[in-house]
Amino acid sequence: MDESKENRKIETKELVRQYLKRKYPDAQFSDIDLDFLVRYSVKKEPSANTILKSIGNDIQTEQAYYNAHPAVKAAKDDLQYIYGRFSQKQKDYKNVFNGSFEAFLAWWCEKTPENGIRHCCYCGVDENTLKDAFKNGLVISKKPSFSGELQIERKDPDGDYCDNNCEFACVICNNAKSDMISAEDFTKFFVPGIKEYWEHIKEKL
């Protein structure tokens, strides 16, 4: 492996380490775990069993590895979920983070607080409240894309999906702002009412 590829591998491994530390603060991930997650869930090498064999893991199969390391299975699923969000944006828009999942993951990690709980960039509602509101039927939508997941918002709707133009936003804020209102005007004129709405929802949870 040439030096530039090795440096990128180290950078990606450190990025995954930082994200998992925030999302799974009580879990322990070995270097082998991190190597596996980088190659399988980020680099998208096709065979988990081949990766495990090449990195010197003594467990023979992917499922046995997950059985012995449940935190790795959870982390793998989490990283694949993030990749799914990236892939969906790529289908719908051009030039999403310059086509780099690693750049997207770096942005995702940057926007994930130390406690692992993300918030809407406008009204501040946390993703746990958002998920609970949908789960309990307090917020309902017929549109599948309107869910308890935080959406990826472009502050400037005419700009690209990139690290300095994207934030997480709740479905209420993202839908209300659309592409007609500037972030500044939306924050000034609409956000106070949306904050009151979420406080009303929290009282019912």
Regions found by a protein language model. Give the residues of each.
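A detector for short metal-coordination/catalytic motifs
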Residues: 111-113, 149-150, 160-205
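DEDD superfamily 3′-5′ metal-dependent exonuclease/proofreading module
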Residues: 99-101, 116, 133, 200, ...
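Residue-level signal for secondary-structure boundary elements
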Residues: 28, 49, 94, 178, ...
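Short, charged surface segments at domain edges that flank catalytic/cofactor-binding sites
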Residues: 67-127, 158
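Mixed-charge, low-complexity interaction segments
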Residues: 1-83
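Histidine-centered nuclease catalytic patch
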Residues: 121-168, 177
